[in-house]
Swiss-Prot record:
GO terms for molecular function: ATP binding; ATP hydrolysis activity; ATP-dependent protein folding chaperone; heat shock protein binding; protein folding chaperone. NCBIfam families: PRK00290.1 (NF001413). Residues 656-668 have a biased composition (Acidic residues). Probably plays a role in facilitating the assembly of multimeric protein complexes inside the ER. Glycans are attached at residue 617. Belongs to the heat shock protein 70 family. Residues 643-668 are annotated as: Disordered. The keyword Metal-binding does not apply. Keywords: ATP-binding, Endoplasmic reticulum, Glycoprotein, Nucleotide-binding, Signal. This is Luminal-binding protein. One of its GO terms (cellular component) is endoplasmic reticulum lumen. A motif (Prevents secretion from ER) lies at residues 665-668.
């Protein structure tokens, strides 16, 4: 690249960085009136969770199934779109149209080795769209659509938003959304975009281990404590070392692996059973998506059971060709199959400790977060690493992240009150940020684990005589050459006055905001000309037009979902009325003995005809069901009214109305 380093001290003192963080905190307080209630969403690879700070405490909100965590799954059938449990429960029967693990695709490039590996493991189709992995799926009979990972994530975020709205009884537009601490710039920005598509203002992106640390330390007062958060979830792994001191949460170092978690442990089990089936039954099920769906679900169940049992039986009815599958699985075998992956988690722990400059005996508490930390072997390895120190069981590993996000939301909205006013977060940039200089050298402006928000400037100069344009290429990574780092984006600064090499002064400024997202500016000091980075497609960022289109499509889907629900409700109303009538005319305690024979025949005829019509019109529209209900009522209601008048009972529009009030409830 045509810029060379020019000597000028560029480091900003930690005190100023700290003031920057304090300023951001004060600013958040100043902005508070603009925000409504801010919910906290843990958008997980396998499960998501939502919380809100209310009446002086955090409420983790249960979904419509009564569960406090919701599967991060989306599915399409010919009739509707399903999200959460409903999507996961039908996966084995509808594998190609059921989407999961989308967090492993978000913000990545199609050619990333992780994406190429995942493509072989999921039953749905991942396609290349402008260098990004998109999901191609049949949304209904005869219609196939292509979705970005952001759009699928937005569907899950919408589900979490609606869960919170139902609980709070009002519309929600603001949220704090969490990401793995080791997510890079593109992955953070893509998560923010997903929030926009879901109709949310993402007030802040915060790191999952930091959120979990808040959950752990919210009520901890007293002296300074060093804690290590070990966050092993369904798809990602983070380690953060923090100091907590009377409400101030300062991250000292963070490390991790954005492609390691429970899904990988499930995959090892699946590979083991696929080989076993091939050996025992001479049947290869590795390309049979339905069989794999059943096996995936059973492997996840077995893995969970082995956290509390030493042996389980993996049983699947009619796995393939009508053959029932039944095999024992011991905890020892499970640990052997995943031994290298479990041990892999210790590498980031050591790096984070080294970066924080702490000895093992200086860690006061080890906080476990994420469902995979329930695995006994993982706990054992961690305990051995810290010379026998027991990890803390003080937080719920499934809910801690959403809990912390909800607390941060209450701080931003000003609804936290006395309990949260002392809290201050000082988080860090997880990866070194810099630009390419002559010879492909990575010149670092912001080292990893720098407290954010932060701003750093450095002066560079031209490499050639009379050079009027320089290209600024921005990278993230820890290697000394840019070819081994990740390109975030590039832009040109033009209009530099021609001069001998080494004369022009070009100031490059890196600014990382509180979300961990980077902005870069380059300015020619002589002319005052400046350029800011515009995120290009090679960074994997959605354009504004794409986001707007996706927002419109998300709204259309919401409208379609509403129509589907109205259609189901209309069908249920018709069915309820018909079966009510059928029940009443055959029950002596109700209408059977009070009807004339011709009246009974008329009602029986109307009921029979309506039931046949229902069988023949499984996918009728709402209006058709409403019309049919009116037709049946037109036959039955006058007869019911006449009967009640004859018998001196209350006349009513319908026999259904005189039933117990429970008839008005939705049917399960």
């Amino acid at each position: 690249m045509a810029v060379a380093w020019k000597s000028r001290a560029s480091s900003i003192a930690f005190g100023i960085v700290l003031l920057g963080s304090l300023f951001a905190f004060v600013s958040a307080k100043d902005e508070a009136p603009k925000l409504g209630t801010v919910i906290g969403i843990d958008l997980g690879t396998t499960y998501s969770c939502v919380g809100v700070y209310k009446d002086g405490k955090v409420e983790i909100i249960a979904n419509d199934q009564g569960n406090r965590i919701t599967p991060s799954w989306v599915a399409f059938t010919n009739d509707e779109r399903l999200i959460g449990e409903a999507a996961k429960n039908q996966a084995a029967a509808n594998p190609e149209r059921t989407i999961f693990d989308v967090k492993r695709l978000i913000g990545r490039k199609f050619e990333d080795k992780e994406v190429q590996k995942d493509m072989k493991l999921v039953p749905y189709k991942i396609v290349n769209r402008d260098g990004k992995p998109y999901i191609q799926v049949k949304v209904q009979e005869g219609e196939t659509k292509v979705f970005s990972p952001e759009e699928i994530s937005a569907m899950i975020l919408t589900k979490m938003k609606e869960t919170a709205e139902t609980f709070l009884g009002k519309k929600i537009k603001d949220a704090v959304v969490t990401v793995p601490a080791y997510f890079n710039d593109a992955q953070r920005q893509a998560t923010k975009d997903a929030g926009v598509i879901a109709g949310l203002n993402v007030a802040r992106i915060i790191n999952e281990p930091t959120a979990a640390a808040i959950a752990y330390g919210l009520d901890k007062r007293g002296g300074e404590k060093n804690i290590l958060v070990f966050d092993l979830g369904g798809g990602t792994f983070d380690v953060s070392v923090l100091t907590i001191d009377n409400g101030v949460f300062e991250v000292l170092a963070t490390n991790g692996d954005t492609h390691l978690g429970g899904e990988d442990f499930d995959q090892r089990l699946m590979e083991y059973f696929i080989k076993l089936i091939k050996k025992k039954h001479t049947k290869d099920i590795s390309k049979d998506n339905r069989a794999l769906g059943k096996l995936r679900r059973e492997c996840e169940r077995a893995k969970r059971a082995l956290s509390s049992q030493h042996q389980v039986r993996v049983e699947i009815e009619s796995l393939f060709d009508g053959v029932d599958f039944s095999e024992p699985l011991t905890r020892a075998r499970f640990e052997e199959l995943n031994n290298d992956l479990f041990r892999k988690t210790m590498g980031p722990v050591k790096k984070a400790m080294d970066d924080a400059g702490l000895e093992k005996n200086q860690i006061d508490e080890i906080v476990l977060v994420g469902g995979s930390t329930r695995i006994p072997k993982v706990q054992q390895l961690l305990k051995e690493f810290f010379n026998g120190k027991e990890p803390s069981k003080g937080v719920n590993p499934d809910e801690a992240v959403a809990f912390g996000a909800a607390v941060q939301g209450s701080i931003l909205s000003g609804e936290g009150g006395e309990e949260t006013k002392e809290i201050l977060l000082l988080d860090v940039a997880p990866l070194t940020l810099g630009i390419e200089t002559v010879g492909g050298v990575m010149t670092k402006l912001i080292p990893r684990n720098t407290v954010i928000p932060t701003k750093k400037s450095q002066v560079f100069t031209t490499y050639q005589d009379q050079q009027t344009t320089v290209t600024i290429q921005v990278f993230e990574g820890e290697r000394s050459l840019t070819k081994d780092c990740r390109l975030l984006g590039k832009f040109d600064l033009t209009g530099i006055a021609p001069a001998p090499r080494g004369t022009p002064q070009i100031e490059v400024t890196f600014e990382v905001d509180a979300n961990g997202i980077l902005n870069v500016k380059a300015e020619d000091k002589a002319s005052g000309k400046s350029e800011k980075i515009t995120i290009t497609n090679d960074k994997g960022r959605l354009s504004q037009e794409e986001i707007e289109r996706m927002v419109r499509e998300a709204e259309e889907f919401a409208e379609e979902d509403k129509k589907v629900k109205e259609k189901i409700d209309a069908r249920n109303s018709l069915e309820t009325y018909i079966y009510n009538m059928k029940n009443q005319i055959s029950d002596a305690d109700k209408l059977a003995d009070k009807l004339e024979s011709d009246e009974k025949e008329k009602i029986e005829g109307a009921v029979k005809e309506a039931l046949e019509w229902l069988d023949d019109n499984q996918s009728a529209e709402k209006e058709d069901y409403d019309e049919k209900l009116k037709e049946v009522e037109a036959v039955c209601n006058p007869i019911i009214t006449a009967v009640y008048q004859r018998s001196g009972g209350p006349s009513g529009e319908s026999g259904a109305d005189s039933e117990d009030s429970e008839e008005g409830h939705d049917e399960l």
